[in-house]
């Protein structure tokens, strides 16, 4: 990542303002409340604009552009509007109107965002105000095209916890009871030579040598060999992930790959067959043969059962989300809402992903069969299926820390292409690699949390802040496509982790109804009747759609929890004071208060 200082546009910097205060989230604010700033964030320019609000019409305001955000504050006395948009959220910037435009507010900029909203600003035609704002926004929203660093490498925030220590692969596998006499940890990929998109540490069958792994890698797309993701604590069945076999049109076979899958199958003595879930529709899997890919045939893999899960590819998901945006922003058409939502097929895709994950979880838990999961390259649909199945099977992943580990492990370390799918700092908004695969996963988690309201330690805000910073480029957590790229860029040394922000203020993200249950398997109902559009995420920018507020019972429960904590604190203070009095030598007959025993509480 090239590093460069801020450019000539620094002339409007607010650095000379001497009086600042720091809010609880670490954001510096000057006393005039002009614009919030993070440590390392600098103001580039500010301009007077007309914000074309799709809900309330034109609003006169001042827009501030920093190296991290676009911040608009209304200048009108009857409007308190504020827009706070991280530049990483911006997907496209276009000029609207030309030199001959005569319509009111017809000359300015159109900004398309990745988080389901668009922005439109009208500017004066004289003084090159549009050109200046366009160039500055383009430069800092798409820094990779201008040899500038992503803001995460400039962010100087400090937190009292280090989110980079959340996930340690050795500790996580040890929690699962690994290694054991069937599975071993290998460092064959420590320099990312076996597979450059896999993590350095892998768990593989004990009976498979490193040379076996190298031979298997030649027959799997991108060298992404079958490796263990999760082992059942009781029946010892496993979830294994990989990419498609390189069968091709001629139906090539690889004895090493076939033997390797047999070794995986033999780690489980309860069932005679290994279950393979191919996430793709069968027609797509067949079509992949033309490009050298394919699937495990019955002829070659006698001891395996293959099932196709009919989950569509990244291009279908991208178009589906575009249709969702069309119906939720800026206006929601009530009269045709249900038919419009159905036409997007978004919930249908959510249903298919959840259904596939349920099959994986059920086969492992109830069917007592080990499972191998793959799609084409094993970093999109595969990650969705393994992580959701693990969330259903393992209650640890339903805690805040456990979910962070799940994301770090199954998505980040195993090479989901965040940079390509999100387009961090990249101006090529038409890139065919863009796709909302991780958003879809988080949506599935939200659907599960609605069906099991006491099963998850985290609340909806936890999921939303993860999605917001998926785009923001404020943290290093989701940057780059794989672990090897993050190592080269020293991401853990040079950037801050999103988990640092979350774990320094966990109470904000806790579900008050959470009940910790060990070994409870969740089987959500993946029917269209039980799935719903996540209004608080997809339609949150529309002020006419009332946000779903916590119900009175939840609010009262949270108040009681706060009251309990306050009473416990007071009680501890009284006990400390009483202990101090009892330890002092009495100078007079004991008073009733000195004789008071420690009070026990049922809280």
UniProtKB/Swiss-Prot annotation:
**Lineage from the top down?**
Eukaryota, Metazoa, Chordata, Craniata, Vertebrata
Annotated region Disordered: where? 1-25, 579-603
Result, substituting residue 380 to A: Does not affect interaction with DES
- The PTM Phosphoserine maps to 13, 18, 588
Q: What is the effect of changing residue 87 to P?
A: In CNMX; mild; reduced binding to PI(3,5)P2
GO (cellular component) term, any one? plasma membrane
The listed outcome for residue 220 to A is:
Loss of activity
Segments crossing the lipid bilayer: none
Under which name does UniProt file this protein?
Myotubularin
Give the consequence of mutating residue 49 to F: In CNMX; greatly reduced binding to PI(3,5)P2; abolishes interaction with MTMR12; does not translocate to the late endosome following EGF stimulation; shows normal EGFR degradation
Describe the family membership recorded for this protein in Swiss-Prot or TrEMBL: Belongs to the protein-tyrosine phosphatase family. Non-receptor class myotubularin subfamily.
């Amino acid at each position: 990542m090239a590093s460069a200082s801020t450019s000539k546009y620094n002339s409007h910097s607010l650095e000379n303002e001497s009086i600042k205060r720091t809010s609880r989230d670490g954001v510096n604010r000057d006393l005039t409340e002009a614009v919030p700033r993070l440590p390392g964030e600098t103001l580039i320019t500010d301009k007077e604009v007309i914000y074309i609000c799709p809900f309330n019409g034109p609003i006169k305001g001042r827009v501030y552009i920093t190296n991290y955000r676009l911040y608009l504050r209304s200048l009108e006395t009857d409007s308190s509007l504020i827009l706070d948009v991280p530049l990483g959220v911006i997907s496209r910037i276009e000029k609207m109107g030309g030199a001959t435009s005569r319509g009111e507010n017809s000359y300015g900029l159109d900004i398309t965002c990745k988080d389901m909203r668009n922005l439109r600003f009208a500017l004066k035609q004289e003084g090159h105000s549009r050109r200046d704002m366009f160039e500055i926004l383009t430069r800092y929203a798409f820094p990779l095209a201008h040899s500038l660093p992503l803001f995460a490498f400039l962010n100087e925030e400090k937190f009292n916890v280090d989110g980079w220590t959340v996930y340690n692969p050795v500790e996580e596998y040890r929690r699962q009871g690994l290694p054991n006499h069937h599975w071993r940890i290998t460092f064959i990929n420590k320099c990312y030579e076996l597979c450059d998109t896999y993590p350095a540490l892998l768990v593989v069958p004990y009976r498979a040598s490193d040379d076996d792994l190298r031979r298997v890698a030649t027959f799997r797309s991108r060298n992404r060999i079958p490796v263990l993701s999760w082992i059942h604590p009781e029946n010892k069945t496993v979830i294994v992930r990989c990419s498609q076999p390189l069968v091709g049109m001629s139906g090539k076979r690889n004895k090493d790959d076939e033997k390797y899958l047999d070794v995986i199958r033999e780690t489980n003595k309860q069932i005679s067959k290994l279950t393979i879930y191919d996430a793709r529709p069968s027609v797509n899997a067949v079509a992949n043969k033309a490009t050298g890919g394919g699937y495990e045939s019955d002829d070659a893999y006698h001891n395996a059962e293959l099932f196709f899960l009919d989950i569509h590819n990244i291009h279908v998901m991208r178009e589906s989300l575009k249709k969702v945006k069309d119906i939720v922003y800026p206006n929601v058409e009530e009269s045709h809402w249900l038919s419009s939502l159905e036409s997007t097929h978004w919930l249908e895709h959510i249903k298919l992903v959840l259904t596939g994950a349920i099959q994986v979880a059920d086969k492992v838990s109830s069917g007592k069969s080990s499972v191998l999961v793959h799609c084409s390259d094993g970093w999109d649909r595969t990650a969705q299926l393994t992580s959701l199945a693990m969330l259903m099977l393992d209650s640890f992943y339903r805690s805040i820390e456990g979910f962070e580990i799940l994301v770090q492990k199954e998505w980040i370390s195993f090479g989901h292409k965040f940079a390509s799918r999100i387009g961090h700092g990249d101006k090529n908004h038409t890139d065919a690699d863009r796709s909302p695969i991780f958003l879809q996963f988080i949506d599935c988690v939200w659907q599960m949390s609605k069906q099991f309201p006491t099963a998850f330690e985290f609340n909806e805000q936890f999921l939303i802040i993860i999605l917001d910073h998926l785009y923001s480029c404020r943290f290093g957590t989701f940057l780059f496509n794989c672990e090897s790229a993050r190592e080269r860029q020293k991401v853990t040394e040079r950037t801050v982790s999103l988990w640092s922000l979350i774990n320094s203020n966990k109470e904000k993200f806790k579900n008050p109804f959470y009940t910790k249950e060990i070994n409870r398997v969740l089987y959500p109902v993946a029917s269209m009747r039980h799935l719903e559009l996540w209004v608080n995420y997809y339609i949150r920018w529309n002020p006419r759609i009332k946000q779903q507020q916590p119900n009175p019972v939840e609010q009262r429960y949270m108040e009681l929890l706060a009251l309990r904590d306050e009473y416990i604190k007071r009680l501890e203070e009284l006990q400390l004071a009483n202990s101090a009095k009892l330890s002092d030598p009495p100078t007079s007959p004991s008073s009733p208060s000195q004789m008071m025993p420690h009070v026990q509480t049922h809280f």
